[in-house]
């Protein structure tokens, strides 16, 4: 599992890349393991390798790497609502989110869960998107053309209850459909500033999760045990950001769930590596073209305070 890759695709072996992750997945499969590759959001935005074609090549790389599932993070909306929806259609893998709603119909925009049957077990994933998307993307993208009213919502609630209710409803659906294991695939994070919408608070106010793969706060968290509303402990994990790690969650024959974070991998899928190299070269060439010269100095951070002034 990955999260918050943010288009950092120009790493060098043995650092992690989509080519390395594709090779890692194949290696596990060749060893007789059943493997699912999932992402917890924020994969199409962050560098020019994403913005130069609005995430098209990133999705192509994820397709080639063999991703099976993803949930949208707040930055999946940075290129506008139409592009966000187009990206999800370009993906060969499904997106899920239990709390992204079309206010015109009252219906969820995406499936709330995805079930996989593997080795006789039914593994359900529940997708969750941060309600902070409204403030950490562009609110106008969630409005009608005249920007007079919102036509989409990311359910949250000032006290978090709308979010908790949406998540619990999705968990209950997975249970009804016979899930053996239920895993959250969320872009929520654990930063206190995200309260009451953190993954820890969602776990604490719901029942039914066996594990939760998180994103958003860029936190390196291999395995944290969080009590749910019934007192049962749930494994919470997050890889950090920018391909610093890829997570490996293992469901043992005895049902025990373990996680580890992998920092480097020597292997690389040749086809995925070639796609990445071609795009990196093309973007680097475009960025290297001088189009103007300015006499003034431009700052992202305030020189006096060091605080970021431009987003």
Please report, for each region that a protein language model flagged, where it lies by residue:
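Acidic, metal/ion-coordinating pockets
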Residues: 1-267
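Hard-cation-handling environments
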Residues: 270-311
